Amino acid sequence: MNQPNSLYLALLIEAKWQNPEDFHFSSDFAKHWLLEQGSLSRRLARHCQHLTVELMRNEKSGMGQLTRQETQGLSPEICLIREVVLSGDQTPWVLGRTLIPETTLADQPYDLATLGDIPLGLTVFSAEQVERDALQVAWIETPQGRLLARRSRLWMNHKPMLVAELFLPDAPIYSRESV
């Protein structure tokens, strides 16, 4: 993992999450991106010719390696940790970190542990039963300035996973704003 991605990931993990009703959105444009209920991957794909995934980490880990914030809303068990960078036309747009409990991996129509360079959102939102709840948002201070982030719990066929996403400096969410 390169140094900027390591820094971004550390900042994402330690984000000070807020409920949307308590958050100061910089614009309605950013608010719509952050509160997106559907697949972020699909939304990003509409803004480029080629959406690609760089898989940085895809391994199981015990709950002891997760922060207290991360374990809220998930059962205390081993999780698959999937960390990726989503890029549009070779420009990094979103750093994502997903925690998928072992019980969520079991009995699914898709093998979430072997997605590789397939966007998670395209797979999850292809399932019959998908819901998003516990959506929170944050500003994250970086050496390049303030960046927006969100996290939520996705339910795929009634089984949870926690998804956190940091919108990198060149992401389309900033195309109509100055942060």
From Swiss-Prot:
Record's subcellular location: Cytoplasm
InterPro entries tied to this protein: Chorismate--pyruvate_lyase (IPR007440), Chorismate_lyase_/UTRA_dom_sf (IPR028978)
Catalysed reactions listed for this entry: chorismate = 4-hydroxybenzoate + pyruvate
Known pathway: Cofactor biosynthesis; ubiquinone biosynthesis
Biological process terms in GO annotation: pyruvate biosynthetic process; ubiquinone biosynthetic process
Transferase as UniProt keyword: no
Binding-site positions, substrate: R82, L120, E165
Main location: cytoplasm
Signal peptide range in chain numbering: none
EC nos: 4.1.3.40
Example of a GO cellular component annotation carried by this entry: cytosol
SUPFAM superfamilies: Chorismate lyase-like
Keywords tagged on the record: Cytoplasm, Lyase, Pyruvate, Ubiquinone biosynthesis
One Pfam family here: Chor_lyase
Example GO molecular function: chorismate lyase activity
PANTHER family: CHORISMATE PYRUVATE-LYASE
HAMAP family: UbiC (MF_01632)
Cited function: Removes the pyruvyl group from chorismate, with concomitant aromatization of the ring, to provide 4-hydroxybenzoate (4HB) for the ubiquinone pathway.
Family per record: Belongs to the UbiC family.
Name of protein: Probable chorismate pyruvate-lyase
Gene source species: Vibrio vulnificus (strain CMCP6)
Gene: ubiC
